[in-house]
UniProtKB/Swiss-Prot annotation:
Species per Swiss-Prot/TrEMBL record: Streptococcus thermophilus (strain CNRZ 1066)
Quaternary structure and interacting proteins, as annotated: Homodimer and homohexamer; in equilibrium.
Enzyme class: transferase
GO molecular function: RNA binding; uracil phosphoribosyltransferase activity
Source superkingdom: Bacteria
EC number: 2.4.2.9
Name of protein: Bifunctional protein PyrR
Short motif (PRPP-binding): ranges: 93-105
Gene, per the UniProt record: pyrR
Keyword NAD: no
Catalytic activity: UMP + diphosphate = 5-phospho-alpha-D-ribose 1-diphosphate + uracil
InterPro entries found in the cross-reference section: PRibTrfase_dom (IPR000836), PRTase-like (IPR029057), PyrR (IPR023050), PyrR_bifunctional (IPR050137)
Family: Belongs to the purine/pyrimidine phosphoribosyltransferase family. PyrR subfamily.
Amino acid sequence: MKKKEIVDDVTMKRAITRITYEIIERNKNLDKIVLAGIKTRGVYIAQRIQERLKQLENLDVPLIELDTKAYRDDVKSEQDTSLIPIEIDGTDVILVDDVLYTGRTIRAAIDNIVSHGRPARVGLAVLVDRGHRELPIRADYVGKNIPTSQSEEIEVLVTEVDGKDSVNIIDPN
């Protein structure tokens, strides 16, 4: 099993900053935005985008945490640990996740969101898009496009959980 770092902490910070600038440029009503971090690492990436929006635009963007397990079609869990303390009707929800792969997690996140309200719009921001979609889902904001083979894995590490920021590609062969 080979593991190779393909994004270091500096490059990750730049990618998150670029995503933040794209969110600012493409959204006319920044005050209607709600960031929805997909547990676990998507929440930490969403928090960093939230911090950058505060620094750049002096904007307090609400952040909610989504647990997709109860909404997945491949792994079932009865317990939904989502934290959605605000009304999302009429808002522009931007889902935030670490890696976009098949699209199944995003579909589950959308199901979770619409079970709690009716946003005006749902967008998607991901740190890494690795391809291999099984569903017709495309990210609106992408930090890095990293084409992979089906057998390879992408591992995102964040300081808050793993003690460091990096993205690794793991080749099991």
